[in-house]
């Protein structure tokens, strides 16, 4: 299982300072850890996912740093407009790291309302050309930390 402290430290060592998003049940541990270990100026709980993306964009434009935006996969529909009309490499080329809680993941028992969104999550990310890595519960903390580092580096090279 991924150690929250190690994963958070990996993000910090990769230069992530701002954390913003909409908490979800699958991300409750990392969200609680962020709240306990980040100043209120660097952890902004957003009213919706699109606003969180916009906050991340503003942070990057002001600091040239990569923000982390967290959300549940049901919020992906809310992030499409600001991602494609502002953050996209063809527009303002704003790098950011998305941490998406995957409800309705195929072959994992979940509530009926999450099943369709879960089925199309990776297809949706592929359609809008968002590269992703899946963090599994079996993944070691070290491997998850390496994924975080790699994704922050990738965010800069894509933009």
Residue ranges and their predicted role:
Residues 1-157:
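Thiamine diphosphate
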């Amino acid at each position: 299982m991924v150690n929250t402290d190690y994963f958070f430290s990996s993000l910090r060592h990769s230069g992530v300072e701002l954390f913003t998003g909409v908490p979800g049940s699958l991300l409750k541990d990392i969200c609680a850890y962020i709240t306990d270990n980040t100043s209120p100026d660097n952890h902004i709980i957003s009213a919706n996912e699109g606003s969180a993306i916009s906050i991340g964009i503003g942070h990057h434009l002001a600091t040239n740093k990569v923000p982390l935006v967290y959300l549940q996969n049901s919020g992906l529909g809310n992030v499409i407009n600001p991602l494609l009309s502002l953050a996209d490499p063809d527009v303002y080329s704003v790098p950011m790291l998305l941490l998406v809680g995957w409800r309705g993941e195929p072959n994992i028992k979940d509530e009926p309302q999450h099943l369709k969104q879960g089925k199309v999550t990776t297809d949706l990310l592929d359609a809008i050309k968002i590269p992703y890595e899946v963090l599994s519960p079996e993944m070691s903390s070290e491997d998850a930390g390496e994924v975080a580092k790699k994704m922050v580096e990738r965010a800069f090279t894509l933009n």
